[in-house]
Design a protein with these regions (language model features):
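A structural boundary/capping signal
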Residues: 1-289
Length: 289
């Protein structure tokens, strides 16, 4: 099992992390997500097959663009074109009834079922847009992944798009309502930081964290461990991965468990779960002294 894990992580590092994620090759965002699916769950999956399906959609969208009367100086018209193709012709839709299902994080399943959550629908949206030379960037918005088109980076002139809501254009009012819906009564200000461009590392780590939460709920600790090690391969100093590795090791290696939890608190002394982690440390020390 350990050798199998090492092989998976080594493949992830060589074929995806070093090749695409670290250089932040956004044109490979779909391939990264598919490799993630293959390593964690669908070991026999043919990644090339799904890339060919994406490529076919890209070609169809490009043909649609060439036959249209779109004014390319007006980004909203290009957004309308992508929305028409993705949500009406291809019939991709938001999985509002089974949002927490871990399958929503696997791009191969989203391509097959035409249903997903904000982050996977955003990956498809970004990839389709690339085929018509419309460069979009991922946005790691709290609790709800978005994408954006940058008109003028220096002056923060941009268009925020929500692929989970059929490509709706989000103005500041809509964004504020969205964040208030997730954090009621906290009056979190809408800042430029919340809609910053995300890099490939942040996108893949967000998917992996989603999966970790799901695997923890269903007690699939082997899969949780794989996802956690995949995060470490991207970011060896990821504080939540350090904490979760400690939790995974708590029965196998309590001393290492304590070391990791202490490291987590050193890196995140103001963490929301700091009090809980301190109680765990105390209970482990009492148990093994």
């Amino acid at each position: 099992m350990l050798e199998d894990l090492d092989l998976k992580i080594n493949n992830w590092i060589i074929n995806t992390v070093n090749s695409f994620i670290k250089p932040n090759k956004l044109d490979k965002i779909a391939e990264c997500a598919l490799q993630l699916s293959k390593i964690i769950y669908y070991n026999d999956m043919n990644v090339k097959k799904y890339l060919e399906e994406i490529n076919l959609m890209q070609k169809e969208l490009n043909i649609k663009r060439e036959s249209s009367n779109i004014n390319f100086s007006r980004p909203t018209q290009i957004i309308e074109l992508i929305n028409e193709y993705m949500f009406k012709e291809q019939e991709f839709k938001a999985n509002i009834h089974d949002y927490q299902n871990p399958l929503n994080n696997f791009l191969n399943i989203v391509i097959e079922k035409k249903i997903g959550i904000p982050i996977t629908l955003s990956i498809i949206y970004i990839t389709l847009a690339q085929s018509v030379n419309f460069i979009l960037y991922p946005v790691n918005f709290p609790r709800h992944f978005l994408v954006k088109y940058v008109l003028d980076d220096a002056n923060h002139n941009e268009i925020i798009i929500d692929p989970f809501n059929n490509g709706r254009i989000m103005d500041d009012y809509a964004l504020k309502n969205l964040i208030d819906s997730f954090f009621p009564n906290q009056n979190i200000p809408l800042t430029k930081k919340l809609v910053e461009k995300a890099n490939l590392s942040q996108v893949m780590i967000r998917i992996l964290n989603n999966l970790k939460d799901s695997f923890f709920e269903i007690q699939e600790f082997d899969k949780l461990n794989i996802a956690n090690e995949m995060i470490f391969a991207i970011d060896p100093k990821n504080t939540y991965a350090i904490r979760d590795k400690g939790i995974i090791l708590q029965e196998k290696d309590p001393e290492k468990y304590l070391e990791l939890l202490n490291t987590y608190l050193e890196l995140e002394p103001e963490a929301n779960d700091a009090d809980i982690v301190l109680k765990i440390i105390k209970s482990i020390r009492e148990k093994y002294r």
